[in-house]
Protein backbone atom coordinates (compact mmCIF):
# COMPACT_ATOMS: atom_id res chain seq x y z
CA UNK A 1 0.00 0.00 0.00
CA UNK A 2 1.28 3.47 -0.87
CA UNK A 3 1.25 6.52 1.35
CA UNK A 4 3.12 9.61 2.51
CA UNK A 5 5.02 10.10 5.76
CA UNK A 6 3.30 12.99 7.54
CA UNK A 7 5.13 12.82 10.88
CA UNK A 8 8.24 11.22 12.32
CA UNK A 9 9.04 10.90 16.04
CA UNK A 10 11.73 8.76 17.71
CA UNK A 11 11.94 6.13 14.98
CA UNK A 12 8.19 5.94 14.37
CA UNK A 13 6.80 7.17 11.05
CA UNK A 14 3.16 8.08 10.64
CA UNK A 15 2.03 7.30 7.11
CA UNK A 16 -1.16 8.66 5.59
CA UNK A 17 -2.08 5.82 3.25
CA UNK A 18 -4.20 5.59 0.14
CA UNK A 19 -7.01 3.90 2.13
CA UNK A 20 -7.47 7.11 4.14
CA UNK A 21 -5.94 5.78 7.35
CA UNK A 22 -2.79 6.89 9.14
CA UNK A 23 -0.49 4.01 10.12
CA UNK A 24 2.19 4.05 12.80
CA UNK A 25 5.18 2.43 11.13
CA UNK A 26 8.74 1.40 11.75
CA UNK A 27 11.26 1.37 8.90
CA UNK A 28 12.78 -1.88 7.68
CA UNK A 29 16.28 -2.57 8.96
CA UNK A 30 17.72 -2.38 5.44
CA UNK A 31 17.24 1.40 5.46
CA UNK A 32 19.19 1.77 8.69
CA UNK A 33 21.87 -0.58 7.39
CA UNK A 34 22.28 1.56 4.27
CA UNK A 35 22.13 4.74 6.42
CA UNK A 36 19.11 5.88 4.41
CA UNK A 37 16.62 7.39 6.82
CA UNK A 38 12.96 7.96 5.92
CA UNK A 39 11.92 11.62 6.02
CA UNK A 40 8.65 13.45 6.52
CA UNK A 41 7.30 14.06 3.02
CA UNK A 42 8.60 10.77 1.62
CA UNK A 43 6.27 8.81 -0.64
CA UNK A 44 6.52 5.22 0.57
CA UNK A 45 5.17 1.71 0.32
CA UNK A 46 4.07 0.07 3.55
CA UNK A 47 3.07 -3.39 4.68
CA UNK A 48 0.13 -3.39 7.10
CA UNK A 49 1.01 -5.47 10.16
CA UNK A 50 -2.14 -4.82 12.19
CA UNK A 51 -5.16 -3.37 10.44
CA UNK A 52 -7.09 -2.87 13.66
CA UNK A 53 -4.33 -1.04 15.51
CA UNK A 54 -3.19 0.69 12.29
CA UNK A 55 0.39 -0.49 12.56
CA UNK A 56 2.70 -1.12 9.64
CA UNK A 57 6.21 -1.23 8.27
CA UNK A 58 7.83 1.04 5.68
CA UNK A 59 9.13 -1.29 2.98
CA UNK A 60 10.14 1.09 0.20
CA UNK A 61 10.95 4.78 -0.16
CA UNK A 62 10.14 6.28 -3.56
CA UNK A 63 12.58 8.56 -5.37
CA UNK A 64 12.76 12.04 -3.87
CA UNK A 65 12.55 15.23 -5.92
CA UNK A 66 14.49 17.04 -3.17
CA UNK A 67 15.41 16.78 0.49
CA UNK A 68 16.62 19.07 3.26
CA UNK A 69 18.74 18.41 6.32
CA UNK A 70 17.38 21.11 8.61
CA UNK A 71 14.52 20.61 8.92
CA UNK A 72 14.75 16.99 7.74
CA UNK A 73 12.03 16.78 5.08
CA UNK A 74 11.61 15.61 1.49
CA UNK A 75 9.54 16.39 -1.60
CA UNK A 76 8.64 19.99 -0.79
CA UNK A 77 7.41 22.55 -3.32
CA UNK A 78 8.71 25.62 -1.52
CA UNK A 79 10.07 26.97 1.77
CA UNK A 80 8.64 29.66 4.02
CA UNK A 81 11.68 31.05 5.83
CA UNK A 82 10.56 32.93 8.94
CA UNK A 83 12.64 35.43 10.90
CA UNK A 84 11.51 37.97 13.50
CA UNK A 85 11.98 41.70 13.21
CA UNK A 86 12.96 41.74 16.89
CA UNK A 87 12.89 39.59 20.03
CA UNK A 88 15.01 37.80 18.86
CA UNK A 89 16.80 40.20 16.54
CA UNK A 90 17.30 38.84 13.01
CA UNK A 91 20.59 37.13 12.21
CA UNK A 92 21.00 37.98 8.54
CA UNK A 93 23.99 35.67 8.05
CA UNK A 94 21.80 32.80 9.25
CA UNK A 95 19.00 33.92 6.95
CA UNK A 96 21.39 33.92 4.01
CA UNK A 97 22.52 30.39 4.94
CA UNK A 98 18.90 29.24 4.91
CA UNK A 99 18.40 30.80 1.48
CA UNK A 100 21.59 29.25 0.10
CA UNK A 101 20.50 25.83 1.38
CA UNK A 102 17.15 26.17 -0.40
CA UNK A 103 18.83 27.33 -3.62
CA UNK A 104 21.16 24.33 -3.51
CA UNK A 105 18.20 21.95 -3.34
CA UNK A 106 16.18 23.90 -5.94
CA UNK A 107 13.51 24.76 -3.38
CA UNK A 108 11.92 28.19 -4.02
CA UNK A 109 11.95 30.32 -0.87
CA UNK A 110 9.51 32.91 0.43
CA UNK A 111 10.80 35.14 3.24
CA UNK A 112 8.49 36.07 6.10
CA UNK A 113 9.54 38.71 8.62
CA UNK A 114 7.27 38.16 11.62
CA UNK A 115 6.67 40.49 14.59
CA UNK A 116 6.39 43.48 12.27
CA UNK A 117 4.75 45.37 15.13
CA UNK A 118 8.19 45.53 16.81
CA UNK A 119 9.81 47.39 13.91
CA UNK A 120 9.58 50.84 12.36
CA UNK A 121 8.13 51.45 8.91
CA UNK A 122 11.62 52.40 7.72
CA UNK A 123 13.07 49.07 8.91
CA UNK A 124 10.26 47.10 7.30
CA UNK A 125 10.60 48.92 3.99
CA UNK A 126 14.39 48.50 3.93
CA UNK A 127 14.26 44.72 4.41
CA UNK A 128 11.32 44.37 2.04
CA UNK A 129 13.11 46.19 -0.77
CA UNK A 130 16.47 44.53 -0.06
CA UNK A 131 15.22 40.97 -0.44
CA UNK A 132 12.66 41.78 -3.14
CA UNK A 133 15.51 43.16 -5.24
CA UNK A 134 17.22 39.76 -4.87
CA UNK A 135 14.18 38.07 -6.39
CA UNK A 136 12.44 36.81 -3.24
CA UNK A 137 8.82 37.23 -2.31
CA UNK A 138 8.72 38.96 1.08
CA UNK A 139 5.84 38.92 3.57
CA UNK A 140 5.65 41.13 6.65
CA UNK A 141 3.49 39.57 9.35
CA UNK A 142 2.44 39.74 12.98
CA UNK A 143 1.06 36.55 14.48
CA UNK A 144 0.10 38.55 17.56
CA UNK A 145 -2.04 41.03 15.62
CA UNK A 146 -3.12 38.70 12.82
CA UNK A 147 -1.41 40.77 10.13
CA UNK A 148 -0.11 39.19 6.93
CA UNK A 149 -1.95 35.90 7.46
CA UNK A 150 -4.01 36.24 4.28
CA UNK A 151 -0.89 36.73 2.21
CA UNK A 152 0.73 33.68 3.80
CA UNK A 153 -2.39 31.60 3.10
CA UNK A 154 -2.25 32.52 -0.59
CA UNK A 155 1.40 31.44 -0.74
CA UNK A 156 0.63 28.09 0.92
CA UNK A 157 -2.40 27.10 -1.18
CA UNK A 158 -1.91 23.89 -3.15
CA UNK A 159 1.74 23.46 -2.20
CA UNK A 160 3.77 21.39 0.23
CA UNK A 161 5.72 24.03 2.12
CA UNK A 162 8.51 23.55 4.64
CA UNK A 163 8.58 26.16 7.40
CA UNK A 164 12.10 27.03 8.52
CA UNK A 165 13.76 29.56 10.77
CA UNK A 166 15.44 29.97 14.16
CA UNK A 167 13.73 29.47 17.52
CA UNK A 168 11.48 32.15 18.92
CA UNK A 169 10.55 33.87 15.66
CA UNK A 170 6.91 32.74 15.69
CA UNK A 171 6.83 29.67 13.43
CA UNK A 172 4.48 27.78 15.74
CA UNK A 173 2.37 30.87 16.47
CA UNK A 174 1.86 31.53 12.77
CA UNK A 175 1.06 27.87 12.13
CA UNK A 176 -1.54 27.91 14.91
CA UNK A 177 -3.07 31.10 13.46
CA UNK A 178 -3.44 29.52 10.03
CA UNK A 179 -5.17 26.28 11.06
CA UNK A 180 -6.99 24.63 13.97
CA UNK A 181 -6.29 20.94 13.34
CA UNK A 182 -2.96 20.80 15.20
CA UNK A 183 -1.93 22.98 18.14
CA UNK A 184 1.80 23.63 17.98
CA UNK A 185 3.62 24.35 21.24
CA UNK A 186 4.89 27.92 21.50
CA UNK A 187 7.79 29.07 23.65
CA UNK A 188 9.10 32.11 25.43
CA UNK A 189 12.14 34.23 24.65
CA UNK A 190 15.06 33.94 27.05
CA UNK A 191 15.32 37.35 28.74
CA UNK A 192 19.03 36.88 29.38
CA UNK A 193 20.09 35.61 25.95
CA UNK A 194 17.32 37.24 23.87
CA UNK A 195 16.99 33.96 22.00
CA UNK A 196 14.14 31.58 21.49
CA UNK A 197 13.82 28.29 23.30
CA UNK A 198 13.32 25.15 21.21
CA UNK A 199 9.72 23.93 21.33
CA UNK A 200 9.15 22.12 18.01
CA UNK A 201 11.09 18.85 18.13
CA UNK A 202 9.73 16.96 15.15
CA UNK A 203 8.73 17.52 11.54
CA UNK A 204 5.09 17.18 10.59
CA UNK A 205 2.83 17.84 7.60
CA UNK A 206 -0.15 20.00 8.58
CA UNK A 207 -3.01 20.88 6.18
CA UNK A 208 -3.22 24.67 5.83
CA UNK A 209 -5.19 26.98 3.50
CA UNK A 210 -7.25 24.20 1.96
CA UNK A 211 -10.01 25.13 -0.45
Where do the protein language model's features map onto the residues?
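Loop/turn-to-beta-strand initiation segments
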Residues: 78, 108, 159, 209-211
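Conserved C-terminal guanine-recognition region of P-loop GTPase G domains, centered on the G4
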Residues: 68-138
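Walker A/P-loop
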Residues: 167, 172-173, 177
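Conserved RecA-like P-loop NTPase ATPase core
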Residues: 156, 174, 206
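Switch I (effector-binding) loop of TRAFAC-class P-loop GTPase G-domains
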Residues: 65, 180-211
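N-terminal accessory targeting/assembly segments
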Residues: 1-92
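Canonical P-loop GTPase G-domain recognition
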Residues: 118-169
